[in-house]
Amino acid sequence: MNQQILITAVQLGELIGQGRCVVVDCRFDLVETKKGRIAWLEGHIPGAGYADLDSDLSLPIGPDTGRHPLPETEKFAGFLASLGWTEDKLLVAYDEGSNAIAVRLWWLMRYYGT
């Protein structure tokens, strides 16, 4: 499978205009955990949903887990559905800084085969 992973702003605009993608804002701060959602509320790419690392892309920390355990399959599928994502649409994730949370969302989609 040969898929383009990175796109330009112009390509994103075209995809949005064609209704062919779901856009997800993944901004998150590990110290100030509400900072990303606040930034999304203050401004984001039009139509973009928000992915919260702690509540959408991870399970709660347990006694035998790491800092951000993988979400269960059903939870992750439900999150994607809540964004309006279906298999016929591209999912475009964006972030700021290191883009680590956007990459996590991309990786979770690969991991779960979506």
What spans do the regions from the language model cover?
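Cytosolic catalytic domains that perform sulfur/thiol-centered chemistry
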Residues: M1-T114
